[in-house]
Amino acid sequence: MSDKPNNFPPLPRFIPLKPCFYQDFDTDIPDLHRTTAKRLYYLWMLNSITLGVNLIGCLAWLIGGGSATNFGLAFLWLILFTPCSYVCWFRPIYKAFKTDSSFNFMAFFFTFTAQLVISIIQAVGIPGWGVCGWIASISFFGTNVGSAVVMLIPTIMFTAVAVLSFVALTKVHRFYRGAGGSLSKAQEEWTTGAWKNPHVQQAAQNAAFGATQGAMTQNEPQYSATPNYGYSNEM
């Protein structure tokens, strides 16, 4: 087990709560996967920001004559989905890249697919569901144009999150299958308990780092001897 103190989320000192997770892309994630892991983290941040903007959009919806139910649900989605999405799909893919764990990859695919479906529903925007999607925003133009324009901002952001989520899911799945991952490997990890064994995880992490360094070494030009370019010594 790592003795490093938890550093995420970075809470102010006056809050009587401590960080729950340790997160360091440079030390935990191999170079080969670091960019993808960071992009998924940025996607989680974009999704969280979108939920906050959606709350503002639902407030404009309420001021323009909409239902208070939408504002209440928007607040609920913000405080519920922000931490749950981090725990349910970002942490599994973070640990999957860190330890090359098939079980965590499968956990990510399952929860992130649900995240994708939710993002599509949010982009559609069914009235009364607490989201400013396309249906809710466009239909409200006949009631209050100003509020509808504000509602379009989270609508566009929800659409972007849905598109980026689909791209991310496709990319990670292509990598996983290309690396030889399968459901049977995930089931084997679950049966043997390797997915939660810290010693196995550390060994897998070391192997992943070693494989990455080996691939980088192979890509470097190799010279059997100092090259001689035949320059003349005559002046």
Swiss-Prot record:
KW Transmembrane helix (keyword) present: yes
Membrane-side (Cytoplasmic) residue stretches: 1-39, 89-102, 170-235
GO BP of this protein: exocytosis; positive regulation of calcium ion-dependent exocytosis; positive regulation of cytokine production; protein transport
Keywords assigned: Cell membrane, Cytoplasmic vesicle, Endosome, Exocytosis, Golgi apparatus, Membrane, Protein transport, Synapse, Transmembrane, Transmembrane helix, Transport
Transmembrane segments annotated in the record for this chain: 40-60, 68-88, 103-125, 149-169
Protein localization: Cell membrane; Golgi apparatus membrane; Golgi apparatus, trans-Golgi network membrane; Recycling endosome membrane
InterPro entries documented for this protein: SCAMP (IPR007273)
Membrane-protein topology: Multi-pass membrane protein
Keyword Transmembrane (UniProt): yes
Side of membrane Extracellular, spans: 61-67, 126-148
This protein's GO CC annotations: Golgi membrane; plasma membrane; recycling endosome membrane; synaptic vesicle membrane; trans-Golgi network membrane
Function: Required for the calcium-dependent exocytosis of signal sequence-containing cytokines. Probably acts in cooperation with the SNARE machinery.
Family as reported in the entry's similarity comment: Belongs to the SCAMP family. SCAMP5 subfamily.
Name this polypeptide is given: Secretory carrier-associated membrane protein 5A
Organism: Xenopus laevis
